[in-house]
Regions:
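Cell-envelope/extracellular polymer assembly enzymes that use nucleotide-activated donors
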Residues: 3-6, 24, 34, 182
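Short aromatic/hydrophobic "clamp" motif used to bind/position activated sugar donors
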Residues: 86
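Membrane-interface aromatic/basic loop that binds lipid-linked glycans or pyrophosphate carriers
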Residues: 261-323
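Glycine-rich, basic loop-to-helix element that forms the pyrophosphate-binding segment
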Residues: 65-81
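Catalytic core of nucleotide-sugar-dependent glycosyltransferases
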Residues: 200-207, 213-242, 254-284
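Short, well-formed alpha-helical segments that are part of the catalytic scaffolds
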Residues: 13-27
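Donor-binding/catalytic cores of nucleotide-activated saccharide
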Residues: 70, 91-195, 202-219
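A conserved acidic beta->alpha catalytic loop
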Residues: 24, 31, 39-48, 90
Length: 323
């Protein structure tokens, strides 16, 4: 359908938040939508909630599949989508009522392939951390896209995509981290023009049980592979590739800082992360110098990672002694 928006919601054991999410979608001022709920094998009451809403509103289409992961759920949603535009909303998040209307209007007026907005962070205790919105629209040719800048966007939620630009792109089902970041990178690579709308229309819940939080495990290691692929996506876009490699080095430094005390973050993993960090460190330095910054902290971590890990371990011992 010409201007229909297909809203894809991957679902897995989110009964606590699902009503709020679906209600916010159905309350959209822009009514030409279909809501594709893909239940990825939930064991809680998510299935019952989805069926109840589907009975109330014929714009909802509910699909159930055995547990295969969020990437498979999103891929199923894309396959089932009938709209000309696609938006992804996580089942534990919710959107403001003008989310679809405002993004679609900008995308059409500016002839964009992708438009994304700001988010409001909703903490686990219910506290809402708002951003000051200018409601200004920024647009640029996709080849000028950069990571590591204030207006960047690296995930699929909070964005509206022209379907013809992304329908043949698949979420990587072998990744458990940054699979949406890789997908967004591939969408940018396919796009002609993208835009950023400085308005907080998407409410993102920060939950302790989120896959990007907690202790290190082998699934989190797939973040390294995701960023390898992202850098490869932009192989022939010099500026974007440079900024992606700079971000990759930062990601490696972050993993060392956050997980070096975890048992699963063993020597093999540490050495691989350090290898990737050192490989991309020149890009981090070059990119920051281009922007008038000197990344001293990242340089120290990247050049002397084993000393930094030793420091973190000693610091942990001191803190335990002091308790």
């Amino acid at each position: 359908m010409k201007n229909m928006i297909s809203i894809i919601v991957p679902i897995y054991n989110v009964e606590q938040y699902l009503d709020c999410c679906i209600q916010s979608i159905l309350a959209q001022t822009y009514q030409e939508i279909e809501v594709i709920l893909v239940d990825d094998g939930s064991s809680d009451k998510s299935c019952d909630i989805c069926k109840r809403w589907a009975e109330k509103d014929d714009r909802i289409r509910y699909f159930y599949q055995e547990n295969q992961g969020v990437s498979a759920a999103r891929n199923r949603g894309i396959k089932e989508a009938r709209g000309a535009y696609i938006s992804f909303i996580d089942a534990d998040d919710y959107v403001y009522d003008t989310y679809c209307e405002e993004l679609l209007e900008i995308l059409i007026e500016r002839d964009l392939d992708i438009i994304y907005c700001n988010e409001t962070n909703v903490l686990s205790d219910g506290e809402v951390v708002c951003h000051r919105d200018s409601r200004i629209v920024y647009t640029w040719e996709s080849e000028a896209y950069e990571y590591n800048r204030p207006k960047e966007h690296i995930t699929v939620w909070g964005a509206l995509f022209r379907k013809e630009n992304i329908e043949n792109i698949q979420f990587a089902e072998d990744l458990f981290m940054e699979e949406d970041t890789l997908y967004f990178a591939m969408a940018v690579r396919r796009a002609r023009k993208i835009g950023y709308y400085d308005a907080s229309l998407y409410n993102y819940r920060i939950l302790e049980m989120s896959s990007c939080r907690g202790r290190f495990d082998k699934k989190k290691y797939t973040e390294i592979e995701a960023w390898r692929r992202i850098c490869k996506v932009f192989e022939d876009w010099p500026l974007t590739k440079l900024s992606a490699e700079a971000r990759f080095a930062e990601i490696c430094n972050f993993m060392i800082s956050r997980y070096s005390l975890d048992a699963e973050f063993d020597e093999t993993v540490v050495n691989e992360v350090i290898r990737e960090c050192r490989k991309n460190l020149p890009s981090l330095i070059k990119y920051n110098l281009m922007k008038g910054r000197i990344p001293v902290k990242h340089m120290v971590k990247g050049l002397f990672p084993h000393l930094y890990i030793l420091y973190l371990k000693e610091k942990s011992k001191w803190m335990k002694v002091g308790k």
